[in-house]
Amino acid sequence: YYVTSQVTNVLLLLDQYTPFKEALYNSFVKHLPINYKVDLLFHQYNERLFNTIIRESVGKYNKYIVMNFDNEKFSMVLNKIHPTKLLLLDFGKFEKEKYSYICQDFDEAFYQALLMLKEKLRHYPQLVLLFSKNLKHPQSSKEYFTRFCEEQGFLCEIQEDIENLTVRKGVVYIAIKQQDVVKVVKQGRLEGLKCGRDFGLLAYNDIPSYEVIDEGITSLSIDWEMMGNEAANFVLNNVPVQKFLPTEVRLRKSL
């Protein structure tokens, strides 16, 4: 009984599995003592599942670390959790002043990252953002992409049909999904084009394999390990945190 009473139960509710979410998770649990028990669940962007998980978890955990279902709208079911016990991760373009959060900015920070790459991008006259209809990424990123292209004089296109993608010379492709990065590289090879010379490729969210794929894929990303570390600090120290992590550019040979 004594040992059980010392266990701190934590719910870590993420949206879906990706290699960078795994980096977040590994960093999170690495910074917690052995008597902290973490239940890792995924809501898969299913609102009904998200609501069910939250409702059924109320009162069972000491801390709730949650990726909200939507970037634009706070999920009302989270009102069932006391604000001091809840930490919001990643999505956060909504009113959240009474809550702790560690989020990323999909708008202005995305725009500023493109500005940092402006001179590299100028080797290519056109930018194409790969944004399929079912992509669970904030729609507002499209507006900031278009704004950057218009202000900097790039031809721009937002391509929804990734299945029938044709890689063209003189184009930089911005890929959000890991599968789309692979698709662009493979399709470029089929067309006889070299990444980083004939066309460019920029990935959203860095993963270790981007260091070695096709001599290196340039990425823009928050530090997911830092997010995990800071989430662990929230759990351990009971200190409120409200911050947006910086979006960093990792320049490699694909641009």
Predicted regions and their residues:
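An alpha-beta-alpha
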Residues: 111-152, 243-255
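Short, solvent-exposed amphipathic alpha-helices that sit
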Residues: 19-34, 109-116, 136-154, 183, ...
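Alpha-helical recognition/docking segments in bacterial nutrient-uptake
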Residues: 1-112, 172-173, 179
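Short, well-ordered beta-strand segments
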Residues: 10-13, 128, 202
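Short, conserved loop/helix-junction motifs that constitute active-site signature segments
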Residues: 78-83, 121, 191-196
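Hydrophobic alpha-helical segments within soluble ligand-binding/sensing domains
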Residues: 92-128, 181, 220-240
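Flexible loop/turn connectors
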Residues: 167-172, 179-255
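Short beta-strand elements in bilobed, periplasmic/extracellular small-molecule ligand-binding domains
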Residues: 32-44, 126-130, 142-167, 171-172
